[in-house]
């Protein structure tokens, strides 16, 4: 039977050593699902609320015992006895129990943990891998990995302003080869940095985090690493950026502060900077190029570069259909970053992806900087045929767990597996 018999949450640790919520859901016949909720460092103001205890005497105020109690004492009694296959109804009940627009009462970390665990338990009940349970028979496209191999901003303790410099192995024949290419470039970059006397320590997402003279230098180093690994920049491997511009935006001066370079730029100057970079480096995607509330700047960015670059809204959209709808109506961005904990349920996540695709936007499935061994997003990427996944460098087990799951999925799908490379950027006109 697919009836939920037990829902239980506990406090565990994420990749930064901070507490997070783990939930187990057990069905009547013993089928079980377990899920762990991730956590972000650079978070959008419009994200669903991650509930923390605030007790400075315990985990420096970052404990999640309140969220755990909300699962065990409030959510569990309401959904135990429900059918695990009725994911929309279960998610709707949790949203109703919370009663706030941002899940601020029970916590998105409490609600999401249950939502993911229910999906896993339902998949286990019928003996299907999660990607097939969520996506059906047509779930067979493996995503291009967007590998963050050089970290800056909020993800590293260095002077680099741009938060993430990514490589995308678009020239690979399959995911397995794409992962190999990315790993080889990653190791090549380590060698390049070492030869130049630069630090090879890694940031939150597994990428290197050296101090550099400029953001442009980071791009130059990665291009050098791609070449030394035996690949052609712009053909085998493309570049991507997550600027996380909200973190550098001064709301009083309405300028973007590139502290590492000692510059303050207007939105128009930021757009010109991106245009210059994209003309000189094989960049195909830029995430959060402007502040989450700079709609006029985003409009300009999209008009100038939206035909040649994937412009991804993360803080801009926060996996929220209301904000995404506003972006679609105003011709802002052309892609949405999908983070399950930004919205808080599997159902709402799938709704956001569906809305994006219907509007011709791409959807990029993403991790958070505070991750765990949970690999749900790997299955989700294939379930919705997203075509792209962003889950860090091929370094640190919390990142590699997702890549290893995708290797398994590619084997399971077998000859029907597709890896679309550049075709994953289906809305670009260049």
Curated annotation (Swiss-Prot):
Domain of life: Bacteria
Record-listed (2R)-2-phosphoglycerate binding positions: 163, 339, 368-369, 390
Cell compartments where the protein resides: Cytoplasm; Secreted; Cell surface
Catalytic activity as recorded in UniProt: (2R)-2-phosphoglycerate = phosphoenolpyruvate + H2O
Gene that encodes it: eno
Protein's name according to its UniProt entry: Enolase
Pathway assignment: Carbohydrate degradation; glycolysis; pyruvate from D-glyceraldehyde 3-phosphate: step 4/5
Residue positions binding Mg(2+): 242, 287, 314
Database matches in HAMAP family: Enolase
EC numbers for this chain: 4.2.1.11
Described function: Catalyzes the reversible conversion of 2-phosphoglycerate (2-PG) into phosphoenolpyruvate (PEP). It is essential for the degradation of carbohydrates via glycolysis.
GO biological process entries: glycolytic process
Keywords assigned by UniProt, alphabetized: Cytoplasm, Glycolysis, Lyase, Magnesium, Metal-binding, Secreted
Residues annotated as the enzyme's active site: 205 (proton donor), 339 (proton acceptor)
PROSITE patterns: ENOLASE
Gene Ontology CC, one term: cell surface
Molecular function (Gene Ontology), one example: phosphopyruvate hydratase activity
InterPro entries assigned to the protein according to its UniProt record, in alphabetical order: Enolase, Enolase-like_C_sf, Enolase-like_N, Enolase_C, Enolase_CS, Enolase_N
Species name: Clostridioides difficile (strain 630) (Peptoclostridium difficile)
Cofactor note: Binds a second Mg(2+) ion via substrate during catalysis.
């Amino acid at each position: 039977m697919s009836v939920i018999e037990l829902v239980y949450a506990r406090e565990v640790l994420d990749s930064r050593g901070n507490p997070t919520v783990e939930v187990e859901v057990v069905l009547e016949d013993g089928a079980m699902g377990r899920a762990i909720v991730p956590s972000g460092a650079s978070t959008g103001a419009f994200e669903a609320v991650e509930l923390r205890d605030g007790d400075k005497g315990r985990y420096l105020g970052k404990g999640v015992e309140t969220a755990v109690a909300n699962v065990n004492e409030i959510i569990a009694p309401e959904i135990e006895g429900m059918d695990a296959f009725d994911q929309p109804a279960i998610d709707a009940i949790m949203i109703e129990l919370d009663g706030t627009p941002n899940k601020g009462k029970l916590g998105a970390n409490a609600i999401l943990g249950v939502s993911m665990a229910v999906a896993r338990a339902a998949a286990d009940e019928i003996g299907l891998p999660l990607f097939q349970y969520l996506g059906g028979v047509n779930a067979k496209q493996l995503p291009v990995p967007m590998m963050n191999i050089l970290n800056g901003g909020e993800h590293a303790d260095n002077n680099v302003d741009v938060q993430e410099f990514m490589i995308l192995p678009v020239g690979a024949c399959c995911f397995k080869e794409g992962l190999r290419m990315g790993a080889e470039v990653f190791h090549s970059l380590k060698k390049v940095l070492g030869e130049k006397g630069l630090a090879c320590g890694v940031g939150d997402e597994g990428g290197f985090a050296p101090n550099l003279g400029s953001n442009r230098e980071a791009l130059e180093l990665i291009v050098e690493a791609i070449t030394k690994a035996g690949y052609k920049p712009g053909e085998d491997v493309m570049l991507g950026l997550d600027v996380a511009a909200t973190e550098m935006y001064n709301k009083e001066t309405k300028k973007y502060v590139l502290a590492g370079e000692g510059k303050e730029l207007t939105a128009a100057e930021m757009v010109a900077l991106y245009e210059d970079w994209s003309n000189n480096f094989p960049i195909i995607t830029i995430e959060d190029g402007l502040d989450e509330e700079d709609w006029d700047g985003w409009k300009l960015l999209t008009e100038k570069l939206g035909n040649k670059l994937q412009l991804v809204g993360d803080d801009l959209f926060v996996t929220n259909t209301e904000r995404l709808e506003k972006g679609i109506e105003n011709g802002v961005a052309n892609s949405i970053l999908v983070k399950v904990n930004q919205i808080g349920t599997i159902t709402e996540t799938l709704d956001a992806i569906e809305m994006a695709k219907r509007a011709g936007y791409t959807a990029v499935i993403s991790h958070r900087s505070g991750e765990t061994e949970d690999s749900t997003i790997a299955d989700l990427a294939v379930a919705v045929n997203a075509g792209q996944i962003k889950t860090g460098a091929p370094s640190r087990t919390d990142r590699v767990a997702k890549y290893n799951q995708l290797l398994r999925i590619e084997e399971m799908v077998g000859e029907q597996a597709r890896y679309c490379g550049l075709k994953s950027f289906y809305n670009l006109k260049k």
